[in-house]
Design a protein with these regions (language model features):
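Cap/lid segment of the alpha/beta-hydrolase catalytic domain
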Residues: 100, 109-178, 224-225, 356-366, ...
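Short beta-strand/loop motif that positions the catalytic acidic residue
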Residues: 396-398
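Alpha/beta-hydrolase fold nucleophile elbow
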Residues: 179-189
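Conserved alpha/beta-hydrolase "acid-adjacent" motif
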Residues: 404-408
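Catalytic-loop region of hydrolases
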Residues: 24-102, 117-118, 261-263, 267, ...
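Gly/Ala-rich beta-loop-alpha elbow adjacent to hydrolase catalytic centers
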Residues: 188-192, 196
């Protein structure tokens, strides 16, 4: 045996790495580079380097650059569970003196393809060893061509990569520090929220606590709805401009927020956009019949032929947040939803990069996609009994003004979890949901929206009242269930400009 060999039984990491023959020794001068060549199952460490600050790394996500101002060990590895699979993962390890003894895995967004370095750095700054994965491909967040002819890569993206990365990261942590992490958490938003629920539903032994923000859990319904919505906007006479979105949002707030900018209780809002319909004397910016038809779809959601809801609709008042996601900002551009939905049906389902939505029949398309990949991609199983039985804790959150994933989809899932658990009281022992007024997709929006989380703005304080990861940690380690979470509103959503206000969030309902 060359190097150190790691054996993982199920989801449990047992023992310490065995010292084998070759270049590694107990007296290795650099414990970071000594990790190179570590093998455990289908995973192997390819690179391990001690990083001295300042360290800067670019990420395709939101075209941001992450800066790390503390030393750490950067580990890069590859997992090949079957032919055609190549899952890249990274583990960032703070010095032993700064390690809090815990581990945080972080999720992705869109179709993944790269790592969210900012989330890894934020976790490490709080003392965690952190990990992330590209989920088995290097494509852009809206590019799914890697799926054509490769069902094994779809399996990696859907559920396998995030699970195997958890096992690999825990092995690396145990070898590097000489002891395993005492507690393991996962945090994700958007597709990362879907990944989080995959872990809770299918691999409950991987993590002690999980944060699932705005989860893209009903993946097939979301992508079907994205294409259907794009077609509604492309109908003759439809022209939902940015100016119209502003007018609709203002009218919704006037009807349901009493003059405030944010609708505090969208479930109680009864807003009819027909009040803005064009008449003979209407001002420019009024809504055409085709505009109103598109709005009815976006508010009402996706249904099957019998009228059963496949995906609930978006929240009145959120319309300003639809720009880019639902309505493109510039002529000739495609919205994020259209790009993601088209990529899914072209590359996952039709496996034809020239596919177009011409003749798209949403109920039929949904049924076909669900039959092919629903079991691999959807994280909608409400039975979390195995996760609860081993003491797992789950925090869900979702912004009411989310323009990418309808907030009511998470509400529906939460209610299903409550029912499966035997009622709200039993469910409250292991799962809490925080609905965030005025928050858009994973953050931002006009409401108070900063409490940490992947893609979110950092909390002003890393305590259990202001930071969602700290809240989860207190619940898991100390048994202090989160009864409130303070969301902060920074001026212009910029922490450097100071705090403009706060909103106290309480568990739903």
């Amino acid at each position: 045996m060359r190097g150190w060999k790691r054996i993982i039984g199920g989801a449990l990491l047992v023992g310490l790495a065995l010292l084998g023959q070759g270049r590694l020794s107990p007296a290795a001068a650099d414990p970071c580079t000594a990790l190179i060549g570590l093998v455990f199952g289908a995973a192997e460490v390819k690179s391990a380097r001690a990083i001295a600050p300042p360290f800067r790394i670019a990420s395709p996500y939101r075209e941001e650059t992450t800066e790390v101002d503390a030393p750490f060990c950067r580990v890069i590895g590859v997992i090949r569970p079957e032919a055609g699979s190549e899952i890249t993962f990274e583990v960032w390890l703070p010095p032993a003196a700064q390690w809090n003894g815990r581990y945080e895995g972080v999720g992705n967004g869109g179709f993944a393809g790269s790592l969210v370095y900012r989330a890894m750095a934020e976790g490490m700054a709080a003392g965690y060893a952190t990990s992330a994965t590209d989920t088995g491909h290097g494509g852009a967040f809206d590019d799914a061509r890697w799926a054509i002819g490769h069902p094994e890569r779809v399996r990696d993206f859907g559920e396998r990569a995030i699970h195997l990365t958890a096992l690999a990261a825990r092995a690396v942590i145990a070898v590097y520090y000489g002891r395993p992490a005492a507690w393991s958490y996962f945090s994700g938003c958007s597709d990362g929220g879907r990944e989080a629920l995959m872990e809770a539903e299918r691999y409950p032994e991987d993590y002690d606590g999980i944060i699932a923000g705005a989860p893209a859990a009903p993946w097939v319904a979301l992508t079907t709805g994205a294409v259907a919505g794009a077609l509604a906007l492309a109908a003759p006479g439809a022209a939902l401009t940015l100016e119209k979105l502003d007018a609709i949002a203002a009218a919704a707030a006037a009807a349901c927020a009493g003059g405030a900018e944010v609708i505090a209780d969208p479930e109680a809002c009864r807003f009819d956009p027909a009040a803005l319909a064009c008449t003979v004397r209407s001002a420019p910016g009024c809504l055409s019949p085709a505009d109103l038809a598109a709005l009815r779809f976006f508010y009402g959601g996706l249904t099957d032929r019998e009228g059963h809801t496949l995906l609930p609709g978006f929240t009145p008042g959120s319309e300003r947040e639809w720009r880019v996601w639902i309505v493109p900002v510039r002529p000739g551009e495609l919205s994020f939803q259209r790009r993601l939905g088209t990529a899914f049906f072209a590359d996952f389902i039709a496996e034809d990069p020239l596919w177009t939505p011409q003749g798209f029949d949403p109920p039929a398309a949904y049924a076909a996609a669900e039959a092919k990949y629903g079991a691999v991609l959807d994280a909608t199983d409400p039975d979390l009994s195995r996760f609860a039985a081993r003491g797992g804790r789950l925090i869900l959150y979702h912004g009411w003004y989310d323009p990418a994933i309808p907030a009511r989809a998470t509400l529906d899932y939460f209610h299903a979890v409550q029912k499966a658990a035997g009622g709200p009281e039993r469910a409250a022992a292991f799962v809490r949901l925080f609905m965030v007024p005025g928050m858009a997709h994973c953050g931002h929006g006009p409401g108070a929206n900063a409490f940490g989380g992947v893609f979110g703005l950092p909390a002003p304080r890393r305590d259990a009242e202001h930071d969602v990861l700290a809240a989860l940690d207190a619940w898991v380690r100390e048994g202090r269930a989160p009864e409130r979470l303070v969301a902060t509103k920074y001026r212009n959503d910029d922490p450097a400009q100071g705090v403009a206000g706060e909103t106290v969030l309480t568990p739903h309902p």
